[in-house]
Design a protein with these regions (language model features):
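Active-site bordering "gate/hinge" segments
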Residues: 6-306
Length: 306
């Protein structure tokens, strides 16, 4: 299927693919963060930390072979926390011009004047910081056109619809390819940044057998285009997940070993990570409050990558 889209949007997107190298942008953002921190110091902050990020990219969605949306987006923002003694003030903005950034710092300082003194406030100790962070290989830009994105959506959706006659409808397919950067700095002299990309394909379909209907989805996501699953295989996986739900049966009460799928298991461990997070413990909102040294999982539990 051949798809068309507004020439103005296409021109805007293609221009974005040939902007200054992202590493040059990171250098400029580092300078901006440094200026923000210096301004906070001049206004009386005893410590400060700031993060600035930006993201741009393409998103496409289709449904039943028709293009629903084609979007090019470009977003950015800065957040800063300042500390005046043990008083903390925070502010943020999506407007990154220098005048606005200075104003945001001033607002954060003003907020700090009205917050409670808290001895736990402050930035991380200098000796805990990594001043030479490793390159985690997060940046793999993809010069992909909207037409390619549309074709990938169609391939995923059509593969799902053709997989089985019980797949009767689609909730659509989507494709996205984004790149961006993040820079963090604080008053200990740390200013570091990195570029990042994220590409994804997904689809959701509806299955029917008798009077029973179910829906499910599948997706693939990767920093690197080469790490994405084939679009058709994403569609087949969505169909298989949907069909597996049809005529599902409830289990009786029993005590048995359970193997959780990866997409479910990570949420279970997510609850543990949230419960032992410093913020939850500080607010006394964790079920593991005052549980240091307590055995939480069975000694026979183990995590395996399969």
């Amino acid at each position: 299927m051949c798809a068309t889209w507004p020439s103005g949007l296409r021109t805007e997107f293609m221009k974005s693919q040939h902007q200054d190298p992202i590493y040059s942008q990171i250098s400029q953002v580092k300078d901006a963060v440094s200026e923000v921190l210096e301004h906070a110091k001049k206004l009386g902050a005893t410590a400060a930390e700031a993060a600035m990020s930006s993201t741009s990219g393409l998103s496409v969605s289709t449904r039943m072979g028709e293009v629903e949306t084609i979007e090019f987006n470009q977003d950015g923002g800065l957040g800063i926390s300042v500390y005046v003694g043990n008083n903390k003030g925070s502010a943020s903005t999506a407007d990154l011009n220098p005048k606005t950034l200075r104003s945001v710092v001033e607002k954060a300082i003003d907020i700090a004047k009205f917050t409670s003194d808290d001895p736990c406030n402050g930035i991380a100790d200098k000796e805990l910081l990594e001043f030479s962070p490793k390159d985690l290989d997060l940046f793999h830009p993809w010069d992909v056109s909207p037409e390619q994105g549309i074709d990938l959506c169609h391939a995923a959706e059509q593969a799902a619809l053709n997989a089985d006659e019980r797949i009767v409808n689609s909730d659509g397919a989507s494709f996205s390819s984004h790149q961006g950067l993040r820079v963090y700095g604080n008053s200990h002299g740390l200013i570091a940044g990195y570029p990042r990309t994220r590409h994804s394909i997904s689809t959701m379909v509806i299955g029917k057998e008798g009077e029973h209907m179910q829906r499910d989805s599948a997706y693939t996501i990767s920093r690197d285009q080469a790490g994405l699953k084939d679009a058709a295989s994403v569609g087949l996986e969505a169909a298989a997940e949907t069909l597996a739900k049809l005529n599902s049966q409830k289990l009786g009460t029993m005590k048995v070993p359970v193997i959780f799928r990866a997409d479910i298991a990570n949420s279970l461990f997510g609850h543990l990570v949230s419960a032992i997070g410093g913020g939850a413990l500080y607010r006394k909102s964790s079920f593991l409050l005052d549980s240091l040294g307590t055995q939480v999982f069975s000694k026979t539990d183990r995590m395996s990558v399969v």
